[in-house]
Amino acid sequence: MADVLTELPGVGPSTADKLIEGGYLDFMKIATATIGELTDIEGISEKAAAKMIMAARDLCDLGFKSGVELLKQRQSVWRLSTGSTELGTVLAGGIESQSVTEFAGMFGSGKTQIMHQTCVNLQMREKIFADLEGVVEEELEAPKAVYIDTEGTFRPERVVQMAEGAGIDGQTVLDNTFVARAYNSDMQMLFAEKIEDLIKGGNNIKLVIIDSLTSTFRNEFTGRGKLAERQQKLGRHMATLNKLADLYNCIVLVTNQVAAKPDAYFGVAEQAIGGHVVGHAATFRFFLRKSKGDKRVAKLYDSPHLPDSEAVFRITEKGIQD
């Protein structure tokens, strides 16, 4: 691996080892890095970092693509069911890969339940790869999920309960779900960055969940004086998640807390935390709210190609249902 990196200008065996130690295992990782990220590695100057990045981009053939090429790339997108037909209709078939989808809402609105359900549905592989041509299901590796839990709400017993409701083995779902408990924003960001190591280690990671995205940032960066620092850090985190979704054709799901919106005279009186940083980085944005009994309402209010729409779903013992 180190021998490959030495093809870059100014990279000898020693620098290659440092790059690998820093998580830069291939040209693509370097090509999509920033100069600031590479200069964090001891012994790499800004000038050297710039040369490495440009050379890596040339080797990866990064640049402009035609609309036809992008359309072909879009054909590799796969979709994952939430368990609700109505919600699937709103999403034109399910949650898309190569994107970050946000579910925001008050406590009890169903955010974590949807996250648990997608871990279960990920193992129903015929739903995942049904739209991909030339794929033989028997040849597929078991898809795996990564669940970064920042609020201590992941419950393996609930996953088993949902799996049984779907008619699949709960132990299989848990075996194929990596869980990490993040107690602060640094841990949260580190776990997200380590996902690439899992993939390169042979794990077929197809689903990444952050539950919740902003809670650690919100707790650590209090007051207006720290708002800019919080947003910069959150922006870097979102960039990591978008890169994972794009490079590895996986789904990234994030839940988000809400805050009161005192100047709202009509419509929803809450807004998702994270401001424009999260708003611009998330591909699809949902707002969840409680309804009567076990019913919940999911409103899609931001998407690059789908209209605003609502879906009603239920949270039952078996999981997410219509």
From Swiss-Prot:
Amino acids binding ATP: 105-112
A single Gene Ontology MF term assigned here is: ATP hydrolysis activity
Lineage top rank: taxon: Archaea
- Which SUPFAM superfamilies does its entry note? P-loop containing nucleoside triphosphate hydrolases (SSF52540), Rad51 N-terminal domain-like (SSF47794)
Q: Which UniProt keywords apply?
A: ATP-binding, DNA damage, DNA recombination, DNA-binding, Nucleotide-binding
InterPro entries linked: AAA+_ATPase, DNA_recomb/repair_Rad51_C, DNA_recomb/repair_RadA, DNA_recomb/repair_RecA-like, DNA_repair_Rad51/TF_NusA_a-hlx, Hlx-hairpin-Hlx_DNA-bd_motif, P-loop_NTPase, RecA_ATP-bd
A Gene Ontology biological process term: DNA repair
Annotated Pfam families: HHH_5, Rad51
Signal peptide residues are: none
Coiled coil, from the record = none
Has the keyword DNA-binding been applied to this entry? yes
Q: What PANTHER family would the database entry show? A: MEIOTIC RECOMBINATION PROTEIN DMC1_LIM15 HOMOLOG (PTHR22942:SF30), RECA/RAD51/RADA DNA STRAND-PAIRING FAMILY MEMBER (PTHR22942)
Q: What is this protein's function?
A: Involved in DNA repair and in homologous recombination. Binds and assemble on single-stranded DNA to form a nucleoprotein filament. Hydrolyzes ATP in a ssDNA-dependent manner and promotes DNA strand exchange between homologous DNA molecules.
User: Record's family?
Assistant: Belongs to the eukaryotic RecA-like protein family.
Could you tell me what this protein is called? DNA repair and recombination protein RadA
Organism (species): Methanococcus maripaludis (Methanococcus deltae)
